Amino acid sequence: MRVVLDTNCLIMAISARNEYYQVWQDFLDGKYVLCITNEIIEEYSEVIARNISPLLSEFVISTIINRKNVVMKSPSYAFHLIKADEDDNKFVDCAIVANAKYIVSNDRHFDVLREIPFPKVDVIKINQFLLDLQNAAETM
């Protein structure tokens, strides 16, 4: 399953003390494919370095870009589907070009995507994504 993780969800997932740490562990175990772009990686790096630590940022980014279950895309078209926070469109564009199942985000700016019929981009909250991963593990 291909997904795009928004930055806040990645930050929640990388903390071993967070209830969503299993999302990061499942990524490391190859249970889903993370779809990224250079822009997304840059944001991950900047936000983790600023809010947590530069060393952790370097480790997380290195881990992501060296995994086999990562799809790196370079969108050639910007869809501009999110007007409230244009910066979030990098996640939308990545999801579209990577044919991701959904974007994992708790950000309300993504809610507008539920009303846009084309191109269809599904968005789920991180708690639902964790349940999806747990359900997938149970059916294996």
Residue ranges of each PLM-predicted region?
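A secondary-structure boundary/capping signal
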Residues: 6-7, 36-37, 106, 125-126
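Acidic, PIN/NYN-like endoribonuclease modules and their adjacent C-terminal/linker elements
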Residues: 108-140
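Extreme N-terminal starter segment of soluble prokaryotic enzymes
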Residues: 1-2
